[in-house]
């Protein structure tokens, strides 16, 4: 095994520490490895060229410089995948967006990653399903 260093904000570290305690892990490393494995399984669920539908949701701080514009540009650059988007103002500083996407799994994964790695996006999640008539996710 190799040792790496990562930087986490205190809130995220608290979440990991609570998971360590509630799930009975010996330490943070195994909990983080399990989370990484789950993320990798999720991203490998469908072949890149498989037709699918997806829901991508993300919560962000709309005061982050240029973030709303960047998110909007990213969605417009992939307008052929976007079926619908819901925008919710949660409080004075945070918004939630939920987009329904349809297209090839690889392109949807790429779009989802582009949205969620933006600075100021605090939480994000993608749920991918085979399009009607397609094989089930393995």
From Swiss-Prot:
Where on the tree of life does the source sit, at the highest rank? Bacteria
One Pfam family this chain carries?
NikR_C
Which GO biological process categories is it annotated with?
response to nickel cation
* Molecular function per GO: DNA binding; DNA-binding transcription factor activity; nickel cation binding
InterPro entries reported in the protein's UniProt record: Acetolactate_synth/TF_NikR_C, ACT-like_dom_sf, Arc_rbn_hlx_hlx, CopG, CopG/NikR_regulator, Ni_resp_reg_NikR, Nickel_NikR_proteobac, Ribbon_hlx_hlx
Q: How cofactor binds (record note)?
A: Binds 1 nickel ion per subunit.
Cofactor needs: Ni(2+)
Question: Where is Ni(2+) bound in this sequence?
Answer: 76, 87, 89, 95
Keyword tags: DNA-binding, Metal-binding, Nickel, Transcription, Transcription regulation
Q: Which SUPFAM superfamilies match?
A: ACT-like, Ribbon-helix-helix
The stretch of residues making up the signal peptide is none
Protein family per UniProt: Belongs to the transcriptional regulatory CopG/NikR family.
The record describes the protein's role as: Transcriptional regulator.
What protein name applies here?
Putative nickel-responsive regulator
Taxonomic lineage: Bacteria, Pseudomonadati, Pseudomonadota, Gammaproteobacteria, Pseudomonadales
